[in-house]
Amino acid sequence: MAYNRKETGEFGEKLAAEYLKGMGYSIIQTNCRLPEGEIDIVGQDGEYLVFIEVRTKRRLGYGLPAESVTPRKKAHLMASAESYIQKHRLEHFPCRIDFVSVDLSQPEPRLELIKNALGEE
């Protein structure tokens, strides 16, 4: 099991990618770095190009993983997604931002997918 913050995040992202594949997503890219920020996972779900933010927690004392996405982080996610779309000329694809919540507080990891987490497409 991962111990420090970076390792915990990387572990959660690997779990999330496998989880998403099992849900029918195709993984296009992971850890995509852009001037506006990082996109954890870029994938495709049917016709949708999907930008996925993975939130992993080992303890839930401060709330659920998805609750840790601040308004500032949401703004960075949207800006990063727009930058990715422009950089790769993908304006013709419908897009959305999903969250994957990874809870490592139990013996078995629990994952939850929140589709269209920001409510905009």
UniProtKB/Swiss-Prot annotation:
Coiled coil stretches, renumbered: none
InterPro entries per UniProt: Restrct_endonuc-II-like (IPR011335), tRNA_endonuc-like_dom_sf (IPR011856), UPF0102_YraN-like (IPR003509)
Could you cite one Gene Ontology molecular function of this protein?
Answer: nucleic acid binding
Pfam annotation, one family: UPF0102
The family database entries (CDD domains) matched by this protein are listed as: PoNe_Nuclease
Describe the family membership recorded for this protein in Swiss-Prot or TrEMBL: Belongs to the UPF0102 family.
Mind telling me what this protein is named? Answer: UPF0102 protein DehaBAV1_0707
- Species assigned in the record: Dehalococcoides mccartyi (strain ATCC BAA-2100 / JCM 16839 / KCTC 5957 / BAV1)
